[in-house]
Amino acid sequence: MLNETIFGRQVADVREHGLFGRPFWLNALYAFLLYSAFLGYKSYFLHKTSRIPGPWHLHWTMLPALFYYVRGTQWRYVDKLHEKYGPLFRLGSRQIYVSDKDAIRQLLAKENLPKVNWYASLSRDPKTAGMFTTVNKEYHRSRRRLMSPAFAVEFTRQLEPFLVDATTKLFEGYHQRVQKASDPFKPLLFNVYEDLACLAMDILGETAFGVSFNLVACRDDPGADRKFADINKLLAKYLHDGGIRFFCRPFDKYMKRDLNVYKLTNPLVDARFAETEARRAAAGDAAEQVETREDILQYLVDASLEMQKGQKEKLTRTHVRDQCVELLIAGGETTSNTITYILKALLENPAKLAKLYETIEPEPLDDAVPGFTQLPETPYLDACIQEGMRMYPVTSELGRRTGKEPTVVLGHVIPPRTAISASLRALHYSPKYWASPNRYWPERFLPADSIHSASDPAPAADMEAFMPFGCGPRNCIGSKFAWHEMRMVLHTLLARYTISAVEATDKVDFRQFVTFQLAKPEYRIAVTPRMALKA
């Protein structure tokens, strides 16, 4: 028998009592802890990035960093670490953060490092991902080349009527609220955070799907068509599921993804394909002369149908569906949130707001909303927008990773396949590039000889350290359209209404998930008409 031998008795003793007189599970725990301690020691002292400063404890556990990420407060944590360690630090050994302007331009523009895999987790399928979520540089290059004409100056002008129509509905709703008030000149409260989010989605509905989502109308009219009323919630759920799946790898392939947002958007894309194919079949050789709706969806549908079947890079209907949904992700709350934050900054700086009002002529509430090509030159408004984008970038960081080869950043060798994030927020608040970085100071974006700079001259902005739309080949392709939208909405609002603060500054908090957003989805302002209502 085995137990009668010396070896057999030893095995039996280990089974019964464990090694060193301890239970087996306790020995396994000790072994795990020792192994973890060794890995932490190796990461902290022996890794190729060991000379880069950073929190020591994160080499043994990333739980604190994960806690901040899950709560959406990692941006604040990263800011504090940049203040402590400077323009370059590491979280553990595989995550680097950099806030130096030259280093960021090196990573984003010169080397054009690929995005981290977190972006791919946001896509429905990485094989058909759009420009925002793809991590494949070659695929992105081909899609960028395809999409660029749809965001060129001339094409953007063709989209102006859709932008005007959606904006008109918002300000008609505001006008109706004023008319219903018992005292038109008693301040009314507008939750601009949600109002502007609805406006941005309506604009994207018009330009990317050919219909208005009618979200603005749903806020004031109980009888409005509410078919798309939940699209913001469905989009948020879609993104939330993608983020969760990223942290559950490799089991993410067994997790079901919420794709209900596609149930709303796919029929719109399919209908446009059917219309275009039928129109082309009926028109024959004269198809090019048939009038069509000139929007982004039509551009993509035409491009898809015109691509040769034998091409290696195809633009299928699935590609178009995914790209249109990604336009909602990248162009929705990014613009609307920025407008809200600019209003917040102006209300916290009454002298700047008063100065801005001096440059904008008042308008009646029932005037037609001017298109962005009809707006007058507004240098001080432009400076206020730029300063707002500096202080409130749409994302606190841009995640990239090194490829198969190492790269050198600020004299440090970064090994292959290491995540390295460009800290845009830390860059925009660096006293190295910005005098009084915590001060809202629009004059820094004006020429020194500008009449608007005379009363409060500021050091000139360092435009190389100003990256609200990113930089390099993967910068925001819709930056011109977003700029026009911000100017148009802000000019119309301030021309018609006098705004005043309602929210206490210390009660407004932020979260960073996909974009920089308010912790509580509400920012109210008080408004009164600048001109008397017509009888």
Curated annotation (Swiss-Prot):
Signal peptide: none annotated. Induction: Expression is strongly induced under conditions of nitrogen starvation. Expression is positively regulated by the cluster-specific transcription factor rua1 that recognizes and binds to the specific 5'-T/G-G/T-C-G-C-A-T-A/T-C/T-C/T-G/A-3' upstream activating sequence found in all promoters of the UA biosynthesis genes. It is found in: Membrane. GO terms for molecular function: heme binding; iron ion binding; monooxygenase activity; oxidoreductase activity, acting on paired donors, with incorporation or reduction of molecular oxygen. Glycans are attached at residue 3. Its EC number is 1.-.-.-. The chain crosses the membrane at residues 19-41. Pathway: Secondary metabolite biosynthesis. Keywords: Glycoprotein, Heme, Iron, Membrane, Metal-binding, Monooxygenase, Oxidoreductase, Transmembrane, Transmembrane helix. It is an enzyme of class 1 (oxidoreductase). The keyword Glycoprotein applies. The keyword Cell membrane does not apply. It is a single-pass membrane protein. Cytochrome P450 monooxygenase; part of the gene cluster that mediates the biosynthesis of the glycolipid biosurfactant ustilagic acid (UA). UA is a secreted cellobiose glycolipid that is toxic for many microorganisms and confers biocontrol activity to U.maydis. UA consists of 15,16-dihydroxypalmitic or 2,15,16-trihydroxypalmitic acid, which is O-glycosidically linked to cellobiose at its terminal hydroxyl group. In addition, the cellobiose moiety is acetylated and acylated with a short-chain hydroxy fatty acid. This is Cytochrome P450 monooxygenase cayp2.
